[in-house]
């Protein structure tokens, strides 16, 4: 995130991912990870959507952040949910923390966060980056070009056209939990007869 935020001096950044499955935080100092943890390890609630005091306190024991980096644009996500007949999305738990209230915050698009996580932790100086998931704010598929310290979007596709949601639907169809057990479904695929339903799925 130090590269993403354009920081060249020593800085401590708290990266936060929540209000979705598997909430997590990461604390970085000058781009080096000091702490990273999932909320579920502290709350004992599988796939916990929210951070909690124990997790945040543990992260802050490694240093006080100069800035908070949030993994999506909440107002865009809220707009998408409302336009689809929902109620607007949840409030992140970390906003309840008085000690984080005045820390400068910066949000990044959901798919940019995916792209950055893959590219900036790789050993490549340039790369084509493909993001496929269920849904970000609106994006479901995106292609990026990484060059040096820069990432720029090339092409995007928006909800409801989503390979990730399509895959999760099949995960649920075979009796597994969507947004959790897709990896089991993927592993099972190697033992099945792919031709059995291929034409039906292709027609869809």
Identify the role of each PLM range.
Residues 6-204:
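Short acidic/glycine-rich loops and adjacent helix/strand connectors
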